Amino acid sequence: MMNLIEFPWLTAIIALPLVAALAIPIIPDKEGKTVRWYGLGVAFADFALMIAAFWHYYDFQSSSYQFVEKYAWVPQIGLNWSVAVDGLSMPLLLLTGLINTLAIFAAWKVTNKPRLFYGLMLVMYSAQLGVFVAQDLLLFFLMWEIELVPVYLLISIWGGPKRRYAATKFILYTAAASIFILVAGFALAFSGDTVTFDIAALGMKEYPKAIELLAYAGFLIAFGVKLPIFPLHTWLPDAHGEASAPGSMILAGVLLKMGGYALIRFNMEMLPDAHVYFAPVLAILGVVNIVYGACCAFAQTNLKRRLAYSSIAHMGFVLIGLASYTEIGVSGAVLQMVSHGLVAASLFFLTGVTYERTHTLLMDKMGGIGKIMPKTFALYTAGAMASLALPGMSGFVGELMVFIGIATSDVYSSSFKVVVVLLSAVGVILTPIYLLSMLRQVFYGKQSDELHLDAFVPDVKPRELFITASLLLPIIGIGLYPKLITQTYDAKTVEIAAHARQVLPVVAGQQPSSLYSQIFTAPTLANAQVESLVNISK
């Protein structure tokens, strides 16, 4: 009899939504009611299976890969079905399960092609799970690409008036970025005496400096589109502005996290030598994301576009955390991803609830609806408070950890750290201004003459209340007791930070901060000096 710990849990978790999606066309259903219950049931069952497997068999104190499965799939091209989970991927798997399940529940009123809609949702769910557990570069790329097609169709069919433009822009950006994954991956796989696509093996290989730097840059571009990083972000406001509420929940809650996860897994963990050179660039890009995203959010009159630019700003903290080279900074980056996934999903869902009542996303055409929708107003306010990192909410903990991480880092000069912290703080100050302004325009004051409400405007319904509460409760829980989530990945982030620090320069008795400052201010160092900066001090 098979020991349950040896059961292929990850394969089952990935395959369940995909196989269930393939069965949707044969389900007898005329009005779409059976299909939506079926989709919700499958998503919930998969999420429950995930929780049960991790609860019983996952070792939270270990930084090693667990639930390891590896089978030759297409040996002719070196493609293996190689999956595993560790502290970095496990919390993001749980986030993916929660967001996708709630997004399907949020799509309860979809009547246009319901079979296709729920089928695409389940296929996308399966591919997202595959991205977070893939341990073969080709498998990772396959899952990354499969996920693009459902997102494109969900936007182009069930989106807003400019849905085709937004969907086309999304697919062009992300498909073009995927080329960089393939090129960088092949450069690493074929470098050296052995050819391998195993991610762990790729991390142990020695690469010529030029190949490693170019591969890092390629991954940075590819994953920077998904995160997104300025100036590769312009697809996101359009996609959010036109996507349905469930689509926006998944875009903000899961898709952006795929970019952050991949940056940690590939750029920082697999290519630590190149990370030495790119870390200050990540810090600068993080600051730009924060300030630029906050400033652009001010200029938006569309509610969803304002939230989209807010997401760009919040993802800047992930970049700064990775650049800090500290355990608390990397841990804060992971926590920020989980927190933002929950917060953004709640705000985009509540925006959909508001749009359903007001039939507009333009804030200058709203106003005063807090009087007729007090429960929605209260829930939206709670989500906004979480987004502006109010103490007691998860966002506060994540951002604070990133700030402490970069401020206490010993790899940068004091002046560089001061500039990063101060400019990031400017973005933090701007966040409550544009979020509170958003609340005022939508819920306070008098109703706009251009707002044409139905004769009866219902407040938040039980289904909508359940979805929002399912997102807000973990936000508050993590804010009050961060160890609730950090204990699942602390061992892994400590290992990643320590591994990355091994290649930091400690040469001729000099401190890392002085040499790092030398790299940053004098990029044309002699070749011998550059070589010494990336070697471990003996």
From Swiss-Prot:
Membrane topology according to the record: Multi-pass membrane protein
Q: Which UniProt keywords apply?
A: Membrane, NAD, NADP, Plastoquinone, Quinone, Thylakoid, Translocase, Transmembrane, Transmembrane helix
Q: Which GO terms describe its biological process?
A: ATP synthesis coupled electron transport; electron transport coupled proton transport
The record's EC number reads 7.1.1.-
What GO terms are given for molecular function? NADH dehydrogenase (ubiquinone) activity; ubiquinone binding
Q: Where in the cell is it found?
A: Cellular thylakoid membrane
Q: Name one GO cellular component term.
A: plasma membrane-derived thylakoid membrane
Q: What is its main location?
A: membrane
The residues forming a coiled coil are none
Concerning Pfam families, the annotation shows: Proton_antipo_M
Sorted alphabetically, which InterPro entries does this protein's record hold? NADH_Q_OxRdtase_chain4 (IPR022997), NADH_Q_OxRdtase_chainM/4 (IPR010227), NADH_UbQ_OxRdtase (IPR003918), ND/Mrp_TM (IPR001750)
Q: Which reaction does it catalyse?
A: a plastoquinone + NADH + (n+1) H(+)(in) = a plastoquinol + NAD(+) + n H(+)(out); a plastoquinone + NADPH + (n+1) H(+)(in) = a plastoquinol + NADP(+) + n H(+)(out)
Span-the-membrane segments of this chain are 7-27, 37-57, 88-108, 116-136, 137-157, 170-190, 210-230, 244-264, 278-298, 315-335, 336-356, 388-408, 418-438
What the protein does comes down to:
NDH-1 shuttles electrons from NAD(P)H, via FMN and iron-sulfur (Fe-S) centers, to quinones in the respiratory chain. The immediate electron acceptor for the enzyme in this species is believed to be plastoquinone. Couples the redox reaction to proton translocation (for every two electrons transferred, four hydrogen ions are translocated across the cytoplasmic membrane), and thus conserves the redox energy in a proton gradient.
Which family does the entry's similarity section mention? Belongs to the complex I subunit 4 family.
HAMAP family in the cross-refs: NDH1_NuoM (MF_00491)
Q: What is this protein called?
A: NAD(P)H-quinone oxidoreductase chain 4 1
UniProt organism field:
Nostoc sp. (strain PCC 7120 / SAG 25.82 / UTEX 2576)
Q: Which gene encodes it?
A: ndhD1
